[in-house]
Amino acid sequence: MRIKSKDIASALMLSPATVSLVLNNKPGVNEATRKRVFDYLEEMERANQEKIKIQNEENKGTILFLTYIKHGLILKQIANQPVSRLFDDMQAQCALSGYHFSYEVYHEKTGKLEELLTSIKSRNIKGIYFMAAEMIQSDIYPFLKLNIPIVIGDNLFYELGADSYLVDNREGIRRGVDYLVDKGHSHIVYLAQSVDIFNFSERRKAFIEEMEIRQCGDGTNRMLRLGDTVQAVYEAMNQYLDRRLIKTTAFVLESSVITLGATKAILERNIKIPRELSLIGFDSLPMQSIPGLNLTLIKGTHTKRHLAGMKHLIRRLTEQEEETIRVYYRTRLIEGDSVFDKKKYIYH
């Protein structure tokens, strides 16, 4: 267990600088203080070893968090950079219930499914939480044959009896379209990625439905597929802009990839946002990823949702449940400065 310098300093009422000098074997600290620091480290290590021993004695098996990579267009970045805070919380939750926590990435193109299934059987894995955004229904069949509880994140295999924890994509897109229409926009175009996954399919269906409900025309003719990388989206968006914007006053941006690629093309042409073109995005972006643009955003919850799914899986291991559930997490609309209120200025 790695103990942070600031935690040692706080526990021993020393300055972080003093602790750093001791740990790096630097001069300037008296022997009594050095001894206090090293004694504390030994004490913490003994306590940690005892904790591990107790956990091993009480261990009921392992819970696996499995990220399933089909093509890598959506989950590749997550797989390469796991969310440490989420995994720390999941590991703690599993430990409290007497289970080990394990994280694994399966690449469909290069991995061997039979080896993965054999490994799951041999490792005393009691349940699996799937990061399943890229999966299709047939992908889940081999795992169902393991006859252990599973919970699905970011997908829906309801008819197969698998519980799911999802962002309410339809509610989010409805919220976004309504926001634009209420601001006076009707010529709205939906910018999409090329890949078909569950989350995107739900968003596209909701766009078509809400455009019809709000009497804004046929949404199927207002959908433009641009690509699956920021560069591909940027190039396709430039080609679209070369043909000029015909009546279009607002774009709904399907994902962070679309947002980054499309806004780059728009801003390079000095198109004024929001006066000439309004934008509303789906999914959060890193801070300052688009300098000078405060994007209006439809935001889902991810960390809390996946942690709740893991807690539900643990309950499934201890309680008999006959019902199949699907839990939708509502989105939030975060107002930025990227949507022009046409109604406010209609008479100006």
What are these regions (language model features)?
Residues S186-H187, D218-N221, I273-L279:
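Short acidic capping loops at alpha-helix termini that bridge into adjacent secondary structure
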